[in-house]
Amino acid sequence: MANCITLNQTSYHGAGAIQSIPDEVKAHGLNKAFVCSDPDLIKFGVTKKVTDVLDAAKLEYEIYSNIKPNPTIENVQTGVAAFKASGADYFIAIGGGSSMDTAKAIGVIINNPDFEDVRSLEGVAPTTKPTVPIIAVPTTAGTAAEVTINYVIKDDEKQRKFVCVDPKDIPVVAIVDPDMMSSMPYGLTASTGMDALTHAIEGYITKAAWEMTDMFHIKAIEVIARSLRAACENDPKGREDMALGQYIAGMGFSNVGLGIVHSMAHALGAVYDTPHGVANAILLPTVMAYNADATGTKY
């Protein structure tokens, strides 16, 4: 069977990349943004960095902030109603995986109304139409949700997370601007960075891995290993390198999948609301030891 890779996206990298947003909005013929961003990012002025750019370009938007760190079915359902009422025709998702995953799920339901129950999206590509266009602006260097084909939603009632996978749902534009990450505290930088490292390591040893994805994952491991400590100290070069490293890891694992570190981390997050990167960091060494005999020369 042939190997396949999906890289259907325009991405901007580097300090000041958010200034590219108005040009992309105009290039795609978009009108009003539905800005998905969590309450803390709004409170501390991170979201405002982007809305200031929109204001300067006289672009219309509405902000939606009912987003939890592990986004829930309720976050998506209320978001669908708010999007319909807003008159928006695209998303700007500002945040970590929570904001971007919420935007993906809302957009899929908007364009596929037969899947109004978000739980029906679980699995691989059940829908016929892609999500509403998303411009993704990550504020953490970890999830790589801005470049991946999947999104994760929490079912509070059943205390589980479910994964939805569809190549049609990659954001049309990724704005990977390290200045959007400069206010991350030490602990969040470390935990999201460990999420990125886990992506790179697990993607490298999956059964679906091949030469092209190995190239992404090896480079991601190299970049993350040299830059995570510096990023935790808020070094600008460390921030920039981590932003790139986590994106490269996302390009890889989005095409070949992950492993049991992530499976167990999602379970912990669903039951205990454990921060995803923290769960990965705890589990990764034990899983690497468990997998060692099966990884050949890759370790």
PLM regions and their residue ranges:
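Glycine-rich phosphate/pyrophosphate-binding beta-alpha loops
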Residues: G142, Y247-N280
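Gly/Pro-rich interdomain helix-loop hinge
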Residues: V271-Y299
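Glycine/threonine-rich beta-strand-loop-alpha-helix active-site module
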Residues: E74-V176
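Carboxylate- and glycine-rich phosphate/diphosphate-binding segment that chelates Mg2+/Mn2+
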Residues: N150-V256
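Short glycine-rich or small-residue beta-strand-to-loop segments that form or flank ligand, phosphate
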Residues: A33-D38, E62-S65, F91-I94, I135, ...
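An N-terminal, well-structured beta->alpha segment
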Residues: M1-Y64
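N-terminal small/polar loop signature for handling phosphorylated ligands or for N-terminal nucleophile
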Residues: I42-F115, R229-R239
